[in-house]
């Protein structure tokens, strides 16, 4: 698709533009949440479609949410509210929780109240600020060792490693869940981010069987807080849910399960048509929308360059927005961050090319991208 075609597609998609007033009405669900068939419901029984942004940092080598070096916490939360989303996926690392290091002064220089504080104290403040704004939070166990994700060799490809064995993974989940148990706006636990190709769904090797591990992890979380949604990703970077219908996840509390596919066009694959894209994504995860008993889907990550001028990647994104709209999918955009955190292959404070916010975290950096996202907020 050339740039003219992209503009035409943008115009077509934006016919479904939802006003901020309408999205505000959707935003104020009443937690805690539960599931019924393919839907997520609030305490009043109203359907809730999670429309979210990822706000990374507690999973990175600076051990703190991105942007606190550029803008007050309240300013960043207001920007999230103004986007019209109703939730935040908040990545964290086992290292951050277990070691709870003192955050570096440079990473919180716009928030002097956090100087000398420890990482989990800052996370407490972030969760509290989001909750005060009635923004729901999904805690995401992104990595074991704090670093940028993801590769096959980064030591974070399974739900455990030598330094952070499964026993710690389970204990850490219970620790962080209990920490926020009294905060009803913390509504979900994304058990583990992007299991790599080595992980299996079932099989004979318990060290690789993510299906069995996800049941152990989910039940551990529900023991600590039975009111949380449990998000389960798939092997192959959470892009392939083949077999989930034949070997479903079963928790001790039945109405808590959500499957969470991820979607990127990393290889800049030039889809020839929307029908081709639809066929690919139906085969990867979309088929679960038509299986019984139903399980809700929440696209926990998807994204593109903020300028929407990156060729096949942008063309893919416009078509994928259409796919999500046609399937009424819940979602979480990667990412809200305007700048990069420290990590492998990253440069601290460099512009985040997929980010929705400006590098000063005080205005939208990607207005066309935000317009597209607003078409799938209702």
Whereabouts are the PLM-identified features?
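Active-site mouth of glycoside hydrolases
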Residues: 28-246, 360, 364, 368
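Short, hinge-like loop/turn segments at secondary-structure boundaries
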Residues: 106-108, 155-158, 247-251, 317, ...
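Glycoside hydrolase catalytic-domain groove-lining segments
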Residues: 207-307, 319, 325, 329
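Bacterial N-terminal signal peptides that target proteins for export
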Residues: 1-10
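Bacterial N-terminal signal peptides
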Residues: 9-19
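Glycan-binding loop/region signatures in secreted carbohydrate-active enzymes
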Residues: 54-57, 64, 254, 258-260, ...
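Aromatic-rich peripheral "rim/lid" segments of glycoside hydrolase catalytic domains that contact
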Residues: 309-378
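Boundary at the C-terminal end of the N-terminal hydrophobic targeting segment
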Residues: 22-24
């Amino acid at each position: 698709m050339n740039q003219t075609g992209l503009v035409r597609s943008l115009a077509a998609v934006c016919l479904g533009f939802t006003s901020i007033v309408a999205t505000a009405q959707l935003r104020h669900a009443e937690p805690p949440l539960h599931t019924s068939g393919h839907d997520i419901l609030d305490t009043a029984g109203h359907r809730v479609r999670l429309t979210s942004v990822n706000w990374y940092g507690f999973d990175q080598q600076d051990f703190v949410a991105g942007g606190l070096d550029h803008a007050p916490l309240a300013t960043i939360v207001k920007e999230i509210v103004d986007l019209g989303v109703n939730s935040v996926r908040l990545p964290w690392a086992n290292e951050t929780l277990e070691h709870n290091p003192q955050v570096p002064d440079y990473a919180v220089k716009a928030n002097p109240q956090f100087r000398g504080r420890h990482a989990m104290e800052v996370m407490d403040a972030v969760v509290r600020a989001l909750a005060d704004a009635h923004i729901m939070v999904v805690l995401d166990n992104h990595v074991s060792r704090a670093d940028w994700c993801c590769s096959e060799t980064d030591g974070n490809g399974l739900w455990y490693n030598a330094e952070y064995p499964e026993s710690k993974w389970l204990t850490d989940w219970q620790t962080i869940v209990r920490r926020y148990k009294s905060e009803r706006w913390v509504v979900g636990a994304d058990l583990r981010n992007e299991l790599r190709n080595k992980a299996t769904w079932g099989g004979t090797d318990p060290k690789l069987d993510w299906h069995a591990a996800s049941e152990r992890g989910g039940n551990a979380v529900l023991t600590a807080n039975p009111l949380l949604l449990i998000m389960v990703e798939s092997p192959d970077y959470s892009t392939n849910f083949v077999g989930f219908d034949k070997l479903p996840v079963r928790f001790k509390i039945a109405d808590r399960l959500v499957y969470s596919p991820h979607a990127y066009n990393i290889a800049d694959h030039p889809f020839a048509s929307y029908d081709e894209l639809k066929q690919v994504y139906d085969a990867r995860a979309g088929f679960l929308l038509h299986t019984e008993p139903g399980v809700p889907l929440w696209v926990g990550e998807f994204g593109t360059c903020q300028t929407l001028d990156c060729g096949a990647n942008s063309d893919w994104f416009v078509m994928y927005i259409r796919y999500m709209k046609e399937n009424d999918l819940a979602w979480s955009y990667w990412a809200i961050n305007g700048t990069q955190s420290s990590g492998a292959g990253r440069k601290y404070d460099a512009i985040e090319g997929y980010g929705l916010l400006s590098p000063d975290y005080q205005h939208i950096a990607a207005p066309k991208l935000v317009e597209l996202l607003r078409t799938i907020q209702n």
